[in-house]
Amino acid sequence: MNFFKRLFSKSNLELQINDGGRLAAGFKGKAGDCVVRSIAIVTGLSYQKVYNDLYKENEEFRTTSQTKLARSLKQKNDSPRSGTHRVVLKKYLKKLGWNWTPTMFIGQGCKVHLKKDELPSGTLIVSCSKHITVVKDGVL
C-alpha cells in the first residue's frame, strides 16, 4: 500500500483496490502477481485461468528460448506468483488480441506519467518500474 501512497502523492487518478479475483480463486498472502491480476481485470478472464496460462508461458519461455534472459530464469520457479517477465507478458497479451504501445523510448526520458491528463481514455495495462497495473478511464 505504501507504493500507492507514494504514487498518489503526484497523481490525480482515482484509486480503486481490486485483486483481480485472486482471493476468490483461493490464493492467500502476498505475491508478486501484478501481471496476473492486471490481465484478469482488463480481460474479464478468471484469475485462475490467467495464472495457469502464464505459468505455462513462463515455463515455455524458460525451456525453449535461447536468450540470456531465459538461461538466467532456469534457476527460477515458473510461477507467475513470483513475477512474469515483460517478454512473456507481451507475448500473452498479443495472444489475447492486445497491442503493446510503448510511450517511452531509450534516450528520450520520461514523457508520460500516471496522471489522468497524460493518459488516453479507455482501459490500459500500464508498466511502471518493476510493476504492472491497470488504468481504466482515469481510475487506477
Task: Say what each PLM segment does.
Residues 61-130, 136-138:
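Conserved active-site-adjacent core of cysteine acyl-enzyme catalytic domains
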Residues 2-73, 87, 91, 95-98:
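Active-site nucleophile-adjacent alpha helix/oxyanion-hole segment immediately C-terminal to the catalytic cysteine
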